[in-house]
Amino acid sequence: MKKSIIIIFVIAQYFVGLKAKADEGMWLPLLVERLNYVDMQKMGCQLTAEEIYSINNTSLKDAIVVLNNGQCSGFMVSDQGLFFTNHHCARSYIQSHTTLEKDYLLNGFWAKEKYDELRNDKLTASFLIRMEDVTNKILPYVNESMTEEKRIAIIDSISIAIVKSATIGTSYTAKVLPFFQGNEYYLIVNEIFKDVRLVGTPPDAIGEFGTQSDNWKWPRHVSDFTLLRIYTGPDGKPADYS
C-alpha cells in the first residue's frame, strides 16, 4: 500500500513534462500503461494500470488532490472530504489564522468539531477527471513552413475550441498542454473545489523540523503534514464557502 501511495503521489504531478527516459521524473497517468507499467510490475506494483488511472471506474487518480492548480499535492483519506498534504504546503494558510491569542504556528491546531474547522479563502483543491490525447486535432493544421507566431495562434485557437467542447454544461475546467517538445498535445480536465478548510496541523517546530537542511534526506524526523477537508454543495459539486 505504501508503495502504491508513493507511485500515485508522484503521478499526481501530471502537469509537469516528462524526462527523456520513461522511468524517470514525473509521469502522466494517461501514459502509465504505455510507458511505465511493465517496469512498475517488475518493481513490485500489484495494481493494474486500470486501477491506477481510469476514466470509467474509480481509480487511484481519484484519491489525488492538487492544491492551487499545482502548488502542491495531497491524498484523500476519507469519504468525508479529509485529505493530507505537506505542512509546508499549508503553512501560509496556518499563518493567516495565527494571532497573538491563538498562535497555531507555535502550538498547532486541531478542530474538535466540523464547525471549528478554519476557512481558507484562496485555497483550492482540484481532481483530475480525465486526460485525452488531442494531438490529431492540432498537428494536422500546422506545418514547418509557418512562422512561429502563426503556429502558436492556430494551436491556441484549436485549444480554446477543444476546451470549450470538453467543459460546456459541466463544472469542470480544462486546458490543452504540449508534451514531448510539442510533438503531442493532451487535454486535461479538472474539477476545482473552492471550499477547503483547515482541520489539523502539528506545531511548526514539528511540522517544519529540519527545514531545508534535511530536505530530500532519509531518514527524516519530521511530521510534515497538515489535514484539510473539502466541502461541496448538496449535489457533491464545487460550491463557495457557506
Model-derived regions: residue spans:
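Bacterial Sec-dependent N-terminal signal peptides
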Residues: M1-D23
